[in-house]
């Protein structure tokens, strides 16, 4: 339990940041889900469009501190690999 005023403020700030970070992480997952749906549909053009929307969102999460850069690089790499597989 936070006793000092500064500790109470810190608890409130952490709760707010947690909500923001959850929203950002959810947004990334939504974009990845849209990409997966486009791939499942088999339409190369829509999959490429979904990837072009998805990749900047992942990198934005990195710049905001939600994802680690290596995690983002791994996610993007796997998405590109799957996109190329449908193209071939």
Curated annotation (Swiss-Prot):
InterPro entries: Ribosomal_bS20, Ribosomal_bS20_sf
SUPFAM superfamilies recorded: Ribosomal protein S20
This protein's UniProt keywords: Ribonucleoprotein, Ribosomal protein, RNA-binding, rRNA-binding
GO BP term, pick one: translation
MF-aspect GO terms: small ribosomal subunit rRNA binding; structural constituent of ribosome
GO CC field: small ribosomal subunit
Annotated region (Disordered), positions in chain: 1-22
Top-level taxon of origin: Bacteria
Function per UniProt: Binds directly to 16S ribosomal RNA.
Family: Belongs to the bacterial ribosomal protein bS20 family.
Name of protein: Small ribosomal subunit protein bS20
Organism listed in the record: Bartonella bacilliformis (strain ATCC 35685 / KC583 / Herrer 020/F12,63)
Lineage: Bacteria, Pseudomonadati, Pseudomonadota, Alphaproteobacteria, Hyphomicrobiales
Protein encoded by which gene: rpsT
């Amino acid at each position: 339990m936070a006793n000092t005023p500064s500790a109470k403020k810190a608890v409130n700030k952490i709760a707010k940041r947690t909500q923001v970070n959850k929203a950002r992480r959810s947004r990334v997952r939504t974009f990845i889900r849209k990409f997966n749906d486009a791939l499942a549909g088999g339409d190369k053009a829509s999959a490429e469009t979904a990837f072009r929307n998805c990749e900047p969102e992942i990198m934005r999460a990195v710049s905001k501190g939600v994802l680690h850069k290596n995690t983002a690089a791994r996610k993007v790499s796997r998405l590109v690999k799957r996109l190329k597989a449908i193209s071939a």
